[in-house]
Amino acid sequence: MLSWERFVYFFPKVIVKFPVTLEIVLISFGSGLLLGCLLAWIRIKKIPVLSQIAAVFISYIRCTPVICQMFVVYFGVPALLGQMGIDSSAIDRVVYIYIAYGLNNGGFMGETFRSAVLAVPMGQTEAGYAAGLAGWQTLV
């Protein structure tokens, strides 16, 4: 049940943190978009070793819950940096959340972009080449 009194009481407390949420969304979306484009390009071009690494990464990201990925990045990366002799205490903890969400978005976007590009019929691509368009222009 929705209690309007509780809603009115908690809404000002929640809305104060809205800029932080928006910042996490925008940064993770931007980094995920870049990573997704890179992963899709690697998989489409079938670069020998990188294509297999990208396929494993995408499979891992798509098959594990985001909360598990957040735990691995949030607790694992500082521990790994500590093992390497790098002090991670100066790094703000929200950076690890940016990384976790960015990797998650990148994995999903990479597969989405790859499937979208491969869904274009070959005749359409050949028509673009016949019209004198470059490779990247036929993609756009």
Model regions and ranges:
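Transmembrane alpha-helices and adjacent helix-loop boundaries
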Residues: 1-140
